[in-house]
Design a protein with these regions (language model features):
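Acetyl-CoA-dependent GNAT
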Residues: 3, 7-13, 18-32, 37-99, ...
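Short, solvent-exposed coil/turn linker segments
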Residues: 9, 108, 163-166
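Generic low-polarity alpha-helical segments
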Residues: 31, 50-51, 107, 144, ...
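Conserved glycine-rich acetyl-CoA-binding loop
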Residues: 93-111, 118-120, 130-137, 141-142
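C-terminal "cap" of GNAT-fold acetyltransferases
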Residues: 123, 127-136, 140-142, 148-167
Length: 167
C-alpha cells in the first residue's frame, strides 16, 4: 500500500469534502442528528464548489493522505479561537476513511499536522473532539491532556478539549 501526505491543492477540494462527508456519517451516527448527516451527501457537490471558490494557497494548512493515488484522509490545522494559551495552534480536523483506520495513518497525519503547526510558529496545540467520538481515545494515546469540555456550537453538543503542552 503506497501512501503520500502532501499539501492540499485546489483540485483536492471535492475529494476532501467527500472524505469529510463519509467520515462524519461513519463516526457521528447516534451522536449528531441523522437528518444533518444525510444532508451532507445531498450538499456535497455544492460544499465542494464553495470551498474550491474560497481556496487560498497562502492560508492553506490542510494536508491530504493519498493511498494508492486516492485521497482517503486529511488533517487541517491552524490558529485557535481559544485565547487561554500562548503560542497555541489547533488541530481542527483529522479524518480518515474507516477502512484505512488502524493502519498507522492517523498517527502519520497527526504528526504531519504537528509539523505544519511548528512551521506556523506554534509550540503548543489543542484539539476538540465531540464526546462519544472514538477518536477521544486516540488523542489521549497521542499524549493529549483532557483540560475541559466545552460546547461545540454547530450542534450544541459537548466537546472534549485536549492540550498538548509541547509539540
Amino acid at each position: 500500500m503506497n501512501y503520500l501526505i502532501r499539501r492540499k491543492t485546489k483540485e483536492d477540494c471535492a475529494p476532501v469534502v467527500h472524505v469529510a462527508t463519509v467520515v462524519w456519517n461513519e463516526t457521528y451516527k447516534g451522536i449528531v442528528d441523522d437528518d444533518f448527516l444525510n444532508k451532507l451527501y445531498e450538499t456535497e457537490e455544492q460544499r465542494a464548489k464553495e470551498i474550491y471558490n474560497k481556496f487560498n494557497e497562502e492560508d492553506n494548512h490542510q494536508l491530504v493522505l493519498e493511498v494508492d493515488n486516492n485521497i482517503v484522509g486529511f488533517v487541517n490545522v491552524g490558529d485557535t479561537d481559544d485565547t487561554n494559551y500562548d503560542n497555541c495552534g489547533e488541530l481542527h480536523a483529522i479524518y480518515i476513511l474507516g477502512k484505512y483506520k488502524g493502519k498507522g495513518f492517523g498517527k502519520k497525519l497527526f504528526e504531519a499536522g504537528i509539523e505544519e503547526l511548528k512551521r506556523m510558529g506554534y509550540d503548543k496545540m489543542i484539539i476538540g473532539c465531540l464526546v462519544g467520538n472514538p477518536s477521544n481515545d486516540f488523542y489521549k494515546h497521542m499524549g493529549g491532556k483532557l483540560i475541559k469540555t466545552r460546547i461545540f456550537l454547530l450542534f450544541q453538543l459537548p466537546e472534549n478539549v485536549y492540550y498538548f503542552e509541547k509539540i
